[in-house]
UniProtKB/Swiss-Prot annotation:
Entry superkingdom: Bacteria
Cellular component GO terms, alphabetical: small ribosomal subunit
Alphabetized SUPFAM superfamilies for the sequence: Ribosomal protein S7
Subunit structure: Part of the 30S ribosomal subunit. Contacts proteins S9 and S11.
Function: One of the primary rRNA binding proteins, it binds directly to 16S rRNA where it nucleates assembly of the head domain of the 30S subunit. Is located at the subunit interface close to the decoding center, probably blocks exit of the E-site tRNA.
Molecular function terms, GO-annotated: rRNA binding; structural constituent of ribosome; tRNA binding
Gene3D superfamilies: Ribosomal protein S7 domain
Name of the protein in question: Small ribosomal subunit protein uS7
Family matches, as InterPro entries: Ribosomal_uS7 (IPR000235), Ribosomal_uS7_bac/org-type (IPR005717), Ribosomal_uS7_CS (IPR020606), Ribosomal_uS7_dom (IPR023798), Ribosomal_uS7_dom_sf (IPR036823)
One BP term from GO: translation
This protein's record includes keyword rRNA-binding: yes
Family indicated by similarity: Belongs to the universal ribosomal protein uS7 family.
The species this protein was found in: Salinibacter ruber (strain DSM 13855 / M31)
Amino acid sequence: MSRNEAPEQRTTQPDPVYRDDMVSRFVNAIMRDGKKSLARRIVYDTFDVIEERTGEEEGLEVFKKAVNNAAPLVEVRSRRVGGATYQVPTEVRPERRITLAFRWIIQYARARNEKSMVNRLASELVDAARGEGGAVKKKDDTHRMAESNKAFAHFQF
């Protein structure tokens, strides 16, 4: 193990349109093969579609609500103790909460059967903001797993 201090955290620049760090991170999560301009276009067009669908609500607010609804508080991690592997519930760090929410929203948006990624992402974000959709279901499943394995919580990491 290294005796050095922990490396300093990298920070992402806020995105140029909304001046929001979370949107910038979401663009990076959407991006494939380094095509950031395409990822930005998908995210910004998604926010426009959300505003059209919901009417009065702003796309950024729906996005933040969706991420908050899809972010897990606890997760289970495998821990090997004396030949047996236990699923130990652990609290999720704030950074990881948001990262998991992004990952799940994008995963379930890509699995939808709609024409473009913009429409699929908009539908998933609107559903997640309402407390529905695949990403929120995944969060609930994760919480359920942690609840059912509460007995192993004393095997903390």
